[in-house]
Design a protein with these regions (language model features):
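Conserved N-terminal glycine-rich FAD pyrophosphate-binding loop of Rossmann-like flavoproteins
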Residues: 36-59, 196-197
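Glycine-rich nucleotide phosphate-binding loop and flanking beta-alpha elements
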Residues: 15, 123-125, 167, 219
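Short amphipathic alpha-helical segments
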Residues: 19-21, 43-44, 127-131, 171-173, ...
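FAD-binding core/adjacent interface of flavoenzyme oxidoreductases
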Residues: 1-9, 24-25, 37, 80-156
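A Rossmann-like FAD-binding core segment of flavoenzymes
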Residues: 73-104, 109-112, 176-224
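Single conserved hydrophobic/aromatic residue that forms the stacking wall/gate
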Residues: 223-231
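Short beta-strand to alpha-helix junction loop
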Residues: 54-71, 187-197
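Rossmann-like dinucleotide/flavin-binding elements
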Residues: 2-3, 7-36, 139-193
Length: 231
């Protein structure tokens, strides 16, 4: 079993910054993450998405933020275990002291007195659209769950389905490069930041964004149909 001062579940921005804070105290850390790279959803879902609300940093992409955190923790002692999940956490006693024992899906075992859970929304699973049977079969054929390269959508017609922060943020950002962005949401009300929603609606007024609410989306390989929700 591997012994560590702090075991961190999740290697996103919070998990990485925990390594920095622990390092200042001379503590070593072990990070475990289900993804194949550090950075959490910032690296997996929207590496090129601009971030404006980091204290002291007016503008930074999500991947730049992750890269800065990785650079920040270089001086400190930590181990990174990727592409595995925590399968078991149990309390054990060793030499009359209490520890946490952690076992992963790769059958690795760790013991630590401290566990920090920095897992965000948990192991990443895309939010699949309702009423579409097996949407994964369209991946790579015009359907994606994440924007990993803005240039891919340059001068393209883009349809975004969703009503939260990511949908609103990418509607605003992709409108700068896409031929036309259509935002589809199954409700009239949005769940994202008010400021971003106002930006989106301003783009609708300018004709740069086509807004369809309340709509559901159905997909086939050759066409899209957007039937309205009946009250």
């Amino acid at each position: 079993m591997n012994k560590t001062d702090i075991l961190i579940i999740g290697a996103g921005p919070v998990g990485l910054f925990t390594v920095f804070e622990a390092g200042l105290l001379g503590l070593n850390c072990t990070l475990i993450d289900n993804l194949d790279k550090p950075g959490g959803q910032c690296a997996e879902l929207y590496p090129e998405k601009p971030i404006y609300d980091i204290p002291g940093v007016p503008f930074q992409t999500a991947q730049e933020h992750v890269d800065a955190l990785l650079e920040q923790i270089k001086p400190f002692n930590y181990d990174l275990h990727l592409s595995e999940r925590v399968d078991l956490i149990e309390e054990i006693t060793l030499e009359n002291e209490s520890f946490w024992k952690v076992k992963t899906t790769e059958d690795k075992e760790f013991i630590s007195k401290n566990i920090f859970i920095a897992a965000g929304a948990g192991s990443f699973e895309p939010r699949r659209p309702p009423n579409i049977e097996d949407p994964d079969k369209y991946l790579g054929k015009g359907v994606e769950y994440a924007v990993r390269s803005v240039d891919k959508y340059k001068n393209k017609n883009v349809v975004i389905f969703g009503g939260g922060d990511s949908a609103l943020d990418w509607t605003v950002e992709l409108s700068k490069v896409a031929k036309l962005v259509t935002l589809v949401h199954r409700r009239d009300a949005f769940r994202g930041a008010q400021h971003t929603e106002e930006q989106m609606r301003a783009l609708v007024e300018k004709g740069k964004v086509n807004l369809l609410t309340p709509y559901l989306i159905t997909v086939s390989y050759t066409h899209l149909t957007l039937p309205t929700i009946q009250p």
